[in-house]
Regions:
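Positively charged n-region of N-terminal signal peptides that target proteins for export
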Residues: 1-4
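Compositionally biased, low-structure terminal segments
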Residues: 6-7, 28
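Bacterial N-terminal signal peptides
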Residues: 7-17
Length: 186
């Protein structure tokens, strides 16, 4: 009986360790890709993160994780998109803990190795509006970040210098969202 328990623990540890894939010199996790509609990058990234966690928990994507549902609930005409505070609130209302912070390059490897994708805000040039993407991978040796960019494609490779320039324009805004632990019975 005791050896069966340790076998289960060993199997669980292996499964946790393989939630991401090791690239040649980097690390990435398989976050579902959602393409955006016009002004819908915020809805698309929230959808990607929600679908990722629902899949990790063995659930099908819920209606609340559909990008159209998110877009209708959160779109602001004045912003021509979705405010970051609205994304946080939506995630919290749908069972997630959120933490918005000014990120650093090393945060990516640490969180991705824990199986946690990150949402980032980017500003590609001084005249453009904000754009949201999901950091799904990082390759520190080649100085690359792998983005699920809802306007472009899944696992878009971007050089660190270009990425950090666009990210710095948003004060390195980063959002971590993880599922709330199930309520414990007393």
């Amino acid at each position: 009986m005791r050896s069966g328990f340790f076998s289960i623990l060993t199997l669980a540890a292996l499964l946790c360790a393989t939630s991401g894939a090791r690239a040649e010199s980097g690390f990435w996790i398989d976050v579902p890709y959602v393409a955006q509609q016009k002004d819908g990058c915020g809805a698309a990234v929230v959808s990607m993160v929600m679908q990722y966690w629902q899949r990790q928990q063995g659930h099908a994507a819920s209606a609340s994780a559909e990008p159209e549902t998110i877009f209708r609930a959160l779109y602001s005409r004045s912003a021509h998109g979705i405010y970051s505070s609205a994304m946080e609130r939506y995630l919290q209302q749908n069972g997630f803990r959120t933490l918005a912070f000014s990120g650093q390059w090393q945060d990516f490897a640490r969180e991705l190795q824990k199986g946690r994708p990150l949402i980032v805000a980017l500003k590609p040039d001084s005249s453009s509006s904000l754009h949201y993407a999901v950091v799904a991978g990082v390759d520190p040796d080649r100085q690359l970040v792998l983005l699920n960019d809802p306007a472009r494609r899944k696992l878009l490779k971007e050089g660190r210098a270009e990425f950090e320039r666009d990210w710095k324009a948003t004060h390195n805004w980063t959002l971590l969202a993880v599922p709330q632990p199930p309520a414990q019975a007393h």
